[in-house]
Amino acid sequence: IIFLARRNILRLSRFWKAEMTAWPRLDANLILLGEIMLVTAILLMNSADTVLQQMGQEHYPSTGYLPVSGWLGPMLFSGWSADWLMWIERLGWWMHVLVVYGFIVYLSYSKHLHIFLAFPNTWFAKLRSRGEMSNMPVIMNELRSMLGLPSSGEAQTETDTNPEFGAKDIAGLSWKNILDAYTCTECGRCTAVCPANLTGKKLSPRKVMMDIRDRTEEVADKLHSGSEQYIRKDSRGEHVKLDISNFDDGLSLFDRITEEEINACTTCNACVEACPVLIDPLEPILQMRRYQILMESKGPAEWVPMFNALESSGSVWQVPEARSKWTEQLSEK
């Protein structure tokens, strides 16, 4: 009841952001109502059971001390007949069983799937420094070659001849990014501490995870259809079957997550620190930025001089001879 009031009467701001449309709010309320029904059913069952025990009815042996039901039963059902009490006890039992089974079936359609996914997601959370991006083998090998250094030793793949950097769609994200999206509880703690969101920008880390999950489900439904219309044109053929490697429906994550949103991110890691189940909304944002910069040569105009300076002089300030000067103040390890 308290949590329902927080969402619907007090209306805490993090529960009423733009991405919290009718369905996410209804989903949360349905679960809370189900929990209220479950607790009510258990209390009814145990309260009636307690009174039946006191009456010495057959098939109702002592179950031990029940602090709430032991007080509630005599208060509610004192003077009731045994037949009515048995009916109430059975009603409570069936009601709690149906709520539990209904909840299990509903889980696959609800954000409350995180009940099962929170532990594995936490277990597989990255242990390296937060905000650190993984290197791209193709680029690292090119850089090593340019600098006359030996190759990193990572094997070349078939896609290395025409690589795609970053993530345009869910196929460019890792399995952990997808797991993060399905583990999201939509609690809004990440968005509540996001400095970009707090200053009125459109970025909401929670919305990013919700959009990834929704896009994943959309792609999965189309893949399951097996329709040839979703096969990329240059991959179509007589015996070609639809799969994630040749999938193309003309849409992408950028149709859900705008450039304005991903460019508003300051990479401060506040969202990562705030998540109770160690979801990392920053990584998919950075992967989408990679695609935007490396594949489409897009980005805010303010970023262009920085990239040009890095390319020409290896320093954002275009002073290559002084770029390592700051290290002179550090003690040798």
Label each region the model flagged.
Residues 1-154, 206, 210:
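Membrane-embedded alpha-helical bundles of multi-pass integral membrane proteins
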Residues 2, 9, 172-175, 181, ...:
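Iron-sulfur-cluster electron-transfer modules
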Residues 2, 105, 113-114, 191-193, ...:
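Beta-sheet entry/capping signal
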Residues 22-23, 29, 86-94, 173-185, ...:
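Flexible gly/pro/ser-rich segments immediately N-terminal to CXXCH heme-c attachment motifs
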Residues 83-86, 104-108, 176, 182, ...:
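Catalytic cores of large soluble enzymes that bind and process phosphate-bearing ligands
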Residues 84, 101, 175-177, 189-196, ...:
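Glycine- and acidic
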Residues 131-202, 311, 315-331:
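Non-transmembrane accessory domains of multi-pass membrane transporters/channels
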Residues 212-214:
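Short, glycine/proline-biased beta-turn/loop segments that scaffold the active-site neighborhood
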